[in-house]
From Swiss-Prot:
One of its GO terms (biological process) is translation. The gene is MRPL10. Residues 253-262 have a biased composition (Pro residues). It comes from Bos taurus. GO terms for molecular function: structural constituent of ribosome. Its main location: mitochondrion. InterPro entries: Ribosomal_uL10, Ribosomal_uL10-like_sf, Ribosomal_uL10_bac_type. Keywords: Mitochondrion, Ribonucleoprotein, Ribosomal protein, Transit peptide. Gene3D superfamilies: 3.30.70.1730. Belongs to the universal ribosomal protein uL10 family. This is Large ribosomal subunit protein uL10m.
Length: 262
């Protein structure tokens, strides 16, 4: 009996193995605030300040050091193709104009390209990374200062400067920087002055007219003195003919006066 009561008490008060307790204590109250960082102890702060790592200063400023050599870039097929195209553009065209490639809409660029193509003027765009090395090794190296930023080329087999300047005036946000005509470097003002020159046919006509006028004047100058001499001789002959007395054919001329002896 006593053993049974002890078993009941033990079963009701002490949990058996493998079973959860019938009563659990749950804590209801404020939790610990962990959002704030705990302040470091003053002694530890001094220790951390003393043992802080101080990196040595470099002897030479890194900005003064030369940049590391860049790895050589492999020449792809596209780069070789662009180089051949650039060489053909500078070899086959007499007029090469350099313009600043500003932000233009696709419609405006297409319209301007169409207007230039009417006069056989082509628009070419090449990357400066390929264009500048070509110019450095060619006779066009004085054009290098023009290639800053984004540029485009206006090329033609014949110097159509007047038509190009007229079209560029209608597009004020596409500035003309300079270029070359027949291997002669011109500035922007040089292109404008070149466009004001007369056409080749008109210049040839003026030259032929000037040469004809000079030839006619030379001919008149060469004929002036002989004609003047002939007129003077003719006038002299008439004066001599009018001054001679009229002598009849049957009459004898008067004898000369005898010379008196002294």
């Amino acid at each position: 009996m006593a053993a049974a009561v002890a078993g009941m008490l033990r079963g009701g008060l002490l949990p058996q193995a493998g079973r959860l307790p019938t009563h659990q204590f749950i804590r209801y109250g404020s939790k610990a605030v962990t959002r704030h960082r705990r302040v470091m102890h003053f002694e530890r702060q001094k220790l951390m300040a003393v043992t802080e790592y101080i990196a040595p200063k470099p002897v030479v400023n890194p900005r003064c050091l030369p940049p590391p050599p860049s790895p050589p870039q492999e020449e792809t097929g596209l780069i070789r193709l662009l180089r051949r195209e650039i060489a053909a553009v500078f070899r086959d065209n007499r007029m090469i104009a350099v313009c600043q490639n500003v932000a233009m809409s696709a419609e405006d660029k297409l319209l301007m390209r169409h207007q230039l193509r009417k006069h056989k003027i082509l628009m070419k765009v090449f990357p400066n990374q390929i264009l500048k090395p070509f110019l450095e090794d060619s006779k066009y190296q004085n054009l290098l200062p023009l290639f800053v930023g984004h540029n485009l080329l206006l090329v033609s087999e014949e110097p159509k400067v007047k038509e190009m300047v007229r079209i560029l005036k209608s597009v004020p946000f596409l500035p003309l920087l300079g270029g070359c005509i027949d291997d002669t470097i011109l500035s922007r003002q040089g292109f404008i002055n070149y466009s004001k020159l007369p056409s080749l046919a008109l210049a040839q006509g003026e030259l032929v007219g000037g040469l004809t006028l000079l030839t006619a004047r030379t001919h008149s100058l060469l004929q002036h003195h002989p004609l003047q001499l002939t007129a003077l001789l003719d006038q002299y002959a008439r004066q001599q003919h009018e001054g001679d007395p009229v002598v009849p054919a049957s009459a004898q001329p008067d004898p000369p006066n005898p010379v008196q002896d002294s």
